[in-house]
UniProtKB/Swiss-Prot annotation:
Membrane topology value: Multi-pass membrane protein
UniProt protein name: Olfactory receptor 4F3/4F16/4F29
GO MF entry, a single one: G protein-coupled receptor activity
Subcellular location: Cell membrane
Disulfide bridges in this chain: C97-C189
Record key words, sorted: Cell membrane, Disulfide bond, G-protein coupled receptor, Glycoprotein, Membrane, Olfaction, Receptor, Sensory transduction, Transducer, Transmembrane, Transmembrane helix
Pfam families tied to this protein: 7tm_4
Organism (species): Homo sapiens (Human)
Amino acid sequence: MDGENHSVVSEFLFLGLTHSWEIQLLLLVFSSVLYVASITGNILIVFSVTTDPHLHSPMYFLLASLSFIDLGACSVTSPKMIYDLFRKRKVISFGGCIAQIFFIHVVGGVEMVLLIAMAFDRYVALCKPLHYLTIMSPRMCLSFLAVAWTLGVSHSLFQLAFLVNLAFCGPNVLDSFYCDLPRLLRLACTDTYRLQFMVTVNSGFICVGTFFILLISYVFILFTVWKHSSGGSSKALSTLSAHSTVVLLFFGPPMFVYTRPHPNSQMDKFLAIFDAVLTPFLNPVVYTFRNKEMKAAIKRVCKQLVIYKRIS
């Protein structure tokens, strides 16, 4: 009956990050620089791994896959956020909102599985080096990638299944700069308390569960290497430091958002910026630019590009 008294929502209005002109200018510069750096860094990694024979190994295949996903991660919400910074009316269509939610959860799901695959790769390399190439065969790497995409898409469709049949008849204001599923559910015309709980439990359980799987695997790797090598402890710590740093950067913000009992709008926005802009930029820095082989490969790629530009 209430639906007859309201028009169906066809677009959503973002409140954005801040109304301060100075902070908006700072965010514009900060976000634009990091976005361009993220795109450039991750493309360089994918291109280097694809073209350089020295990097045709399971570890770099997984790194390139992660960089490809990070290209999506920084492109789902960042361009729209940058475009809207100085706009008075920040709107997104209903279809655009659904698309944002879909790709956010696909990217998140795929990246979680890839991080588990990379932890397994490091376990085999450190604990079973003689069997590394046998276990981490091309077939195994492709299987990891197929599972990652299957689970990522399945998780996203599962989340959207809660949403597509809901009626939105007003209000249409989201206190954010992107379409966040928990906030969007609160705008539905019907009572969505149970639905919000299920979505939070689903995302929170996946984040926390994957994080603890990775944590346990790292502890097991450290213990195994320390046990079988006199200098194993420091070697393992050095090898796993990059992986654990990226895991903390990736899982920290969503775990904080989905597991705390009392949401805070400003804190959520800060964490969302961190997750959307900073994490995809830091991943290539932490994972690969500290790697001598990767740095050498990127230098070779850059030299080839310079030579090609001069010739053309």
